[in-house]
Amino acid sequence: MIEQMTIEQLLEAYPEGTAEGFAGYCDELSAWQLIVDVTTKLLDDGCWVMVDGQQKTVDISPACIAINGSGFTLVSLPDCHDDAFDAPEIVNNQQAAPEKSAVWALAATVFRMVMGCNIMNGRGGKAQKATSKLPFMRNEMPVLSRLVQQCLDYDVTKRPSLDEVLAAAKENLERCREEMKDGPRMKPETASSTSATQADSAAWPEEMIPAQN
């Protein structure tokens, strides 16, 4: 079970703060590392936290993920809940497996880390319906984007398990590391921008295309 800590304890243990500080600037390697670290924590400690003597589902969002050196760790903080990261079954008070709701929240977190905005036009799970088009993040991150889509499926039974997410993340984290050793696959002048506001709009549902300044 994940233990709750105060903000002061968080900053003492993890002086670099939380992942929220670089939401929108997360590259593919860091995204896979975040998935590996958070899923490992959930599998080791469970999807629960003890608050005031009561067991509750742990919150997952960029503000609840501490930067731990070159990696990340999931923490539980008071007043850290953000309903944009609540899976639709949580919003609708439907009975569901906590693990599958955690998978959804983790995918919504990764989407925000990479794109700099929340899914469903910023409204998260409360706006998702069975007929909602699943968001696609980046054309240059097809494997990561597909995994996020699978994890955000409205149908709980169609989402992968934490074990499946971890296995995919480990494989692709290693792939990214090897690609970094081999050098960039695209010339700098032809590489796609990493800015969320310059993402290929064709990959977005219409309501999620970011405004151009």
Feature roles, as predicted:
Residues 14-37:
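Activation segment of protein kinase catalytic domains, centered on the conserved DFG
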Residues 113-117:
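Hydrophobic anchor on a C-lobe helix of Hanks-type protein kinase catalytic domains
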Residues 139-152:
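Conserved C-terminal C-lobe helix
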Residues 177-213:
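Regulatory extensions appended to serine/threonine kinase catalytic cores
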